[in-house]
UniProtKB/Swiss-Prot annotation:
Gene3D superfamilies: Translation initiation factor 3 (IF-3), C-terminal domain, Translation initiation factor 3 (IF-3), N-terminal domain
The organism of origin for this protein: Elusimicrobium minutum (strain Pei191)
Subcellular compartments: Cytoplasm
PANTHER family for this protein: TRANSLATION INITIATION FACTOR IF-3, TRANSLATION INITIATION FACTOR IF-3, MITOCHONDRIAL
Protein name: Translation initiation factor IF-3
Any GO BP annotation: ribosome disassembly
Pfam families according to UniProt: IF3_C (PF00707), IF3_N (PF05198)
Description of how the protein assembles with itself and partners: Monomer.
The family this protein is said to belong to: Belongs to the IF-3 family.
Role: IF-3 binds to the 30S ribosomal subunit and shifts the equilibrium between 70S ribosomes and their 50S and 30S subunits in favor of the free subunits, thus enhancing the availability of 30S subunits on which protein synthesis initiation begins.
HAMAP family: IF_3 (MF_00080)
Chief place where the protein resides: cytoplasm
Length: 177
């Protein structure tokens, strides 16, 4: 049985003889507009400069082509893509679980962890888990979450308020910008 690898969809850029339209809007290597030219004339001008004719905007009417070095163009496109990836915010959701009868020092340690996560710009979900008869005292868990929210107020906002699901009660903290 053959295993197929997932292929990434690449933006295909036509160059030189791959351009099959009769006329193109031509831009020179220094950025000056040369106007609408036939493809053969544009290819001739590109070969004179020992560069490639690259289709920049295939959807335009007529398509826009530029005379440039194709390998340099691909390098710059890759560089732009990497810069765009760097600029996108990467926020992760961290989850901390505690019991409703947690000791005060243990809660302090958990709050320190939450503060560290928030300083790294991560979102934090604090979950209080109730076991057995603890379900009768959900108000203690709710009070604990509100106390933590008050304590983290200078560095975090609460998103969505208090959420109750089954035997869990949670609150999501988002770092302030």
């Amino acid at each position: 049985m053959a295993r197929y690898e997932k292929q990434e969809k690449k933006d295909f850029v036509r160059k030189n003889e791959q351009i099959r339209v009769p006329q193109v809007r031509l831009i020179d290597s220094d950025g000056t507009m040369l106007g609408v030219k036939s493809v053969t004339e544009a290819l001739y001008l590109a070969k004179q400069q020992e560069l490639d004719l690259v289709e920049i905007s295939p959807t335009a009417e007529p398509p826009v082509c530029k005379i440039l070095d194709y390998s340099k163009y691909l390098y710059e496109q890759g560089k732009k893509l990497k810069d765009a990836k760097k600029k996108t915010a990467k926020t992760a959701m961290k989850e901390l679980r505690i019991k409703s009868r947690i000791a005060s020092h243990d809660l302090e340690v958990k709050i320190k962890h939450i503060e560290d996560f928030l300083k790294r710009k991560d979102m934090v979900r604090l979950v209080v888990v109730f076991h057995g008869r603890e379900n009768q005292h959900r108000d203690l868990g709710e009070q604990m979450l509100h106390d933590v929210a008050k304590r983290l107020e200078p560095i975090a906002n609460v998103e969505g308020g208090l959420q109750v699901t089954g035997n869990r009660m949670s609150m999501i903290f988002v770092p302030k910008n």
